[in-house]
């Protein structure tokens, strides 16, 4: 497969065309961003860690019936993925209240929610990725119909039901996570983007030590060490 010109560069990855019109190469970057890219940094080796972590998680999800855009991993930082049209919604699943949820609703940080909360954000950096509801999704034509909203929510909850016990077995609490979904050329909804410490909050099961991008957001240090610890636990 030939890697061709860059199609898109985001905060954490670059996408490249290939000699197959239905496949792209996704390259994970070492860049770190927070607060809608107002805070920026770089951690050597982070891209490779996220590539490996996300690949392992996507393989786990595929074995459990979740369809993804992943085809194969071809280097330390590169995956071959199916070309798909990204649904312009960030889907957030929360098991424990922290971050923006506590600020918006006044829920005490660390409160275990009675059930997984699914939230939507509009993918628009200029607007600050605002929170939106089902009706917004329909009015803005972000989804095809109400049935697709239900499909998105059901997929998000199924992913959570697979990952929560998996990580619990690795002595990690899956506090919350963000996913992006895409539509293939056959109009099939698939999990796209990544699932990694960049897009999840992981707390140690016993100490509640943060092992994710919050270490960068909150200037806690040892970002790479935390990502390495997550990968080690996934593989063990």
Curated annotation (Swiss-Prot):
Q: Which Pfam families match?
A: SAICAR_synt (PF01259)
- Assigned EC number: 6.3.2.6
> What superkingdom heads the lineage?
Bacteria
Q: In which pathway does it act?
A: Purine metabolism; IMP biosynthesis via de novo pathway; 5-amino-1-(5-phospho-D-ribosyl)imidazole-4-carboxamide from 5-amino-1-(5-phospho-D-ribosyl)imidazole-4-carboxylate: step 1/2
Quick check: keyword Cytoplasm in the entry?
A: no
Q: List the disulfide bonds.
A: none
> Which terms does the record give in the GO molecular function aspect?
ATP binding; phosphoribosylaminoimidazolesuccinocarboxamide synthase activity
Give GO terms for biological process: 'de novo' IMP biosynthetic process; cobalamin biosynthetic process
Catalysed transformations (reactions)? 5-amino-1-(5-phospho-D-ribosyl)imidazole-4-carboxylate + L-aspartate + ATP = (2S)-2-[5-amino-1-(5-phospho-beta-D-ribosyl)imidazole-4-carboxamido]succinate + ADP + phosphate + 2 H(+)
Q: Which UniProt keywords apply?
A: ATP-binding, Ligase, Nucleotide-binding, Purine biosynthesis
Xref: HAMAP family: SAICAR_synth (MF_00137)
In the record, the note on similarity to other proteins reads: Belongs to the SAICAR synthetase family.
Report the protein name in the record. Answer: Phosphoribosylaminoimidazole-succinocarboxamide synthase
* Source organism per UniProt: Campylobacter jejuni subsp. jejuni serotype O:2 (strain ATCC 700819 / NCTC 11168)
